[in-house]
């Protein structure tokens, strides 16, 4: 018996929509990363992008446990000496709702060209509406 290896042009991609209202950030991110990677499919192949498209709505209503709203820090650097910036989860959710989820999912995906292709299939929206009704996404409960 030969080992099955999925071919990129044979992969069937489904669309799923997740409502993130009052869901914990890490639990949503891990499920999204698993589905973007395609590990839930029997034809999963590590070197082929077999994942599905994921739409996350109500990302502004994500929550974290404990005191992470004020204690969890995100860092970025301008490239200049002394140009490090930090912001908390709470401030990031106010300014850019959904970016914390994008960063969490991106950290769970492989680094390199395959991971970059996977993160492009994630669509995050702060409100409860999205422009992907034509794809007829299935509701995914977490």
Swiss-Prot record:
It comes from the Bacteria. InterPro entries: Ribosomal_uL13, Ribosomal_uL13_bac-type, Ribosomal_uL13_sf. One of its GO terms (cellular component) is cytosolic large ribosomal subunit. The keyword NADP does not apply. SUPFAM superfamilies: Ribosomal protein L13. One of its GO terms (biological process) is translation. The keyword Ribonucleoprotein applies. One of its GO terms (molecular function) is structural constituent of ribosome. Pfam families: Ribosomal_L13 (PF00572). Keywords: Ribonucleoprotein, Ribosomal protein. This protein is one of the early assembly proteins of the 50S ribosomal subunit, although it is not seen to bind rRNA by itself. It is important during the early stages of 50S assembly. Part of the 50S ribosomal subunit. Belongs to the universal ribosomal protein uL13 family. NCBIfam families: rplM_bact. This is Large ribosomal subunit protein uL13. The gene is rplM.
């Amino acid at each position: 018996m030969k080992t099955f290896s999925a071919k990129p042009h044979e992969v069937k991609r489904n669309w799923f929509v997740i409502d993130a209202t009052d869901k914990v950030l890490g639990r949503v991110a891990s499920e999204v990363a698993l589905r973007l990677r395609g590990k839930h499919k029997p034809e999963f192949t590590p070197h082929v992008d077999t994942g599905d498209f994921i739409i996350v709505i109500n990302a502004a209503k994500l929550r974290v446990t404990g005191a992470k709203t004020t204690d969890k820090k995100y860092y970025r650097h301008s490239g200049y000496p002394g140009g490090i910036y930090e912001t908390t989860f709470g401030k990031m959710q106010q300014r850019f709702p959904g970016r914390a989820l994008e960063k969490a999912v991106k950290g769970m995906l492989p680094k390199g060209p395959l991971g970059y292709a996977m993160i492009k299939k994630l669509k995050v929206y702060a409100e409860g509406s999205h422009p992907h009704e034509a794809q007829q996404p299935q509701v995914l409960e977490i």
